[in-house]
Amino acid sequence: AENSPIPTSCIDHNRTFFPEMNVVSVTDIERLAKSFPDLENLWDRIPHWIIKADIGRLLYIYFHGNFYFDVDCRIRKKIPLDSERCMILFTEMILKDVNRLGPRECKNPENVLRVANYAFGTNVIKHPFLHEVIMECIKRLAFLIESGPSKLEQLDILWVCGPDVITTVYHRSKNLYPDLILLDMSYLSHLCHGSWRD
């Protein structure tokens, strides 16, 4: 489990943009995971706590709406919430080429534009884009568990539920969701504590 101290300065700063925040417990997430039978069957076999946390953030926002921000994510400016129906994503980075991606990550040329999984939000309960992302995570998780690597590498974790999932689904399906908004990198800064890494 997470052992690093929570960077409260980011949380305090972000309250100026989103005054009502809540902390979600493991119990809350486990209850939501039961809504996806394939995920429920895999849940106790998930090999690393950060995978549960990454899937948990998607589940929570899918079922409740609102925004998710990593605790080490700092909002730089007001996020536009002008629409009655929107799914907001943030650009994580733009790579020079896809050869910098991990061995399993999607190498389609458009995937140089990486979508962040450390921040996203919607004002739509059960937004279908998030459903597609969750289903992609479950598919990758099942593959990883069934292939049974002797040692779970950081690249495995990133592929299962990290930014490659939301990036892949964004590029594959963005035209299906007219309310999908991708904001540029000027809205957030991510301190990238990555305390889950070995």
Sequence positions of predicted segments:
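Small-residue hinge/turn detector
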Residues: 55-66
